[in-house]
Amino acid sequence: MDVERLQEALKDFEKRGKKEVCPVLDQFLCHVAKTGETMIQWSQFKGYFIFKLEKVMDDFRTSAPEPRGPPNPNVEYIPFDEMKERILKIVTGFNGIPFTIQRLCELLTDPRRNYTGTDKFLRGVEKNVMVVSCVCPSSEKNNSNSLNRMNGVMFPGNSPNYTDRSNINGPGTPRPLNRPKLSLSAPLTTNGLPESTDSKDSELQLSEEKGHSDSSASESEVSLLSPVKNKHPDEDAVESEEHEVKRLKFDKEGDVRETASQTVSGEVSSVRAEETETAAPPPDKDRESRTRQHCTEEEEEEEEEEEEEEEESFMTPREMVPERKNQEKESDDALTVNEETSEESHQMEGSGVSPAQTDSTSERSDSAGASRSGSDCLETQESGGPPSSKTGESVSVPSSMESEEATEVTDDPMEQD
């Protein structure tokens, strides 16, 4: 379609006093019905669109009159004239191209394709005109447009609040250009709520000091990491400022948490130390108790040793007394024998006694000593072992008696001679 030719045909249609169908404009409506592309603005072809819609509704009624039977009880019956006025009123109220323009053009170019009755046709047209969203013409999408539309409302292109931009949610939905910037004096928390006024002054100073040094670096990083956002530098600046404010707030919160944790840990450690001091006994008391136990153990060991020594002292004299007596008696016997032999030798020298007599006397003395020693041993066993002092006395007594007996024995041979 030639846009210039189309615009000339629209101008001629408006200049005519009597409205008639134009083949060029009908061809335009067929093109829109097939492709959905509107190459001109709504204000330019709005008049012809309304004329064509009214004419199609009238022709449909003449060709297919209303049914003679009773209306459907489940559907509200609306007269043709009332429905026609309602549809035309909605279409004239549009300030932009409705997003159902393609389906409306299909109904205008070929009304009997899907409908046979006038009532159903009017309800189908009403359903497609009762919309609020609008679309931009195809020429406005490719080139810069001076008009923007939102829900059928047109805004001038030089408005400072809006710019020409197609949105994901729908074409032609405007987007605000100059968003209100967040002041650094009132930053937002992570929940979106403003912080308390106490920390505003300190955050202002820190943000002003670090803002100048970090602004260039943050902008370069944002531009490198997100190249799509470069189309809106103002938005990037606002986002970078928000990131800086949040980073400063998080740093402060981290410092406050660290100090709080340190203080809490110090208090907990002090409380634990006090509890351990109160619960655990002092080391001096432990040492005293240990020394007392050691002393008692040593005393018990000493008492046991003393008892053992006393038992040994009681046992040894009884056991050793017979042996000592035997040794002392043997030594005394040997001494007495020696003395007797010496005396006999002297007497024999003086008296001239024969050696046979001396031998007999020595044998008698030996037998007498042996009998005496046997009697002494029996006496010691019967008495049960007297102490060492008594044994000494007993030993000394037999020695004197033996000496007397020896003298008597020596005197006997002299008397015999």
UniProtKB/Swiss-Prot annotation:
Cytoplasm recorded as keyword: yes
Coiled-coil intervals: none
List of residues that carry Phosphoserine: S159, S226
Keywords tagged on the record: Cytoplasm, Cytoskeleton, mRNA processing, mRNA splicing, Nucleus, Phosphoprotein
Family matches, as InterPro entries: PPP4R2 (IPR015267)
Keyword Nucleus assigned: yes
UniProt biased composition (Acidic residues): 297-313, 402-417
GO cellular component, one term: chromatin
Region (Disordered) location: 141-417
Residue ranges with Basic and acidic residues bias: 197-213, 243-258, 283-296, 320-329
GO biological process: hematopoietic progenitor cell differentiation; mRNA processing; regulation of double-strand break repair; regulation of double-strand break repair via homologous recombination; RNA splicing
MF terms (GO), sorted A to Z: protein phosphatase regulator activity
Biased composition (Polar residues): 158-170, 186-196, 259-268, 378-392
Compartments where located: Cytoplasm, Cytoskeleton, Microtubule organizing center, Centrosome; Nucleus
Biased composition, class Low complexity, residue ranges: 214-226, 367-376
Principal subcellular localisation of the protein: cytoplasm
Function in brief: Regulatory subunit of serine/threonine-protein phosphatase 4 (PP4). May regulate the activity of PPP4C at centrosomal microtubule organizing centers. Its interaction with the SMN complex leads to enhance the temporal localization of snRNPs, suggesting a role of PPP4C in maturation of spliceosomal snRNPs. The PPP4C-PPP4R2-PPP4R3A PP4 complex specifically dephosphorylates H2AX phosphorylated on 'Ser-140' (gamma-H2AX) generated during DNA replication and required for DNA double strand break repair. Mediates RPA2 dephosphorylation by recruiting PPP4C to RPA2 in a DNA damage-dependent manner.
Quaternary structure (record): Serine/threonine-protein phosphatase 4 (PP4) occurs in different assemblies of the catalytic and one or more regulatory subunits. Component of the PP4 complexes PPP4C-PPP4R2, PPP4C-PPP4R2-PPP4R3A and PPP4C-PPP4R2-PPP4R3B. The PPP4C-PPP4R2 complex appears to be a tetramer composed of 2 molecules of PPP4C and 2 molecules of PPP4R2. Interacts with DDX20/GEMIN3 and GEMIN4. Interacts with RPA2; this DNA damage-dependent interaction recruits PPP4C leading to RPA2 dephosphorylation.
Sequence similarity: Belongs to the PPP4R2 family.
Name recorded for this polypeptide: Serine/threonine-protein phosphatase 4 regulatory subunit 2
Species of origin: Mus musculus (Mouse)
